Design a protein with these regions (language model features):
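Single-stranded nucleic acid-binding surfaces, predominantly the OB-fold ssDNA-binding core
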Residues: 1-122
Length: 122
């Protein structure tokens, strides 16, 4: 398993769930890299969808932000694995990340920070 940090846009607002260990969500984050051509120009590379598992107060804050703000650019970091699924006609890759950290990116959007009471953290 690898460890990665990526930045991309939420595909949709994730749904907050409650488990034995507290709140969690699965966020789909779409990432496109810029690729430099031989001419020096840049083009958008293929979009890769990452299924990011987020837990605790980070999950609650991510869901709240996505519901209030819509399409949100986020940075995530965590353990990464790729799973290959073979169908009859195609092969599909699933990119999964168990996030240690999730943050709202400041690129192309403004952010307001509200500090929570220590009793609200998990």
């Amino acid at each position: 398993m690898s460890y990665i940090t990526r930045t991309g846009n939420l595909a949709e607002a994730p749904t907050l769930r409650e488990g034995e260990n507290g709140p969690y969500c699965y966020a789909r984050v779409l990432v496109s890299d810029r690729i430099r051509q031989e001419s020096g120009d840049y083009i958008d590379g293929p979009t890769v969808a990452y299924d990011v598992a987020v837990s605790g107060s980070q999950a609650a804050n991510l869901v709240d932000t996505a519901q209030r703000c819509g399409n949100t650019r986020v940075t995530f970091t965590g353990a990464y694995r790729v799973t290959e699924y073979k169908g009859e006609q195609t092969t599909r890759l699933q990119h999964e990340v168990r996030a240690d950290g999730v943050a709202v990116s400041l690129r192309g959007q403004s952010v307001t920070v509200e500090r929570r009471k220590a009793s609200d953290e998990s």
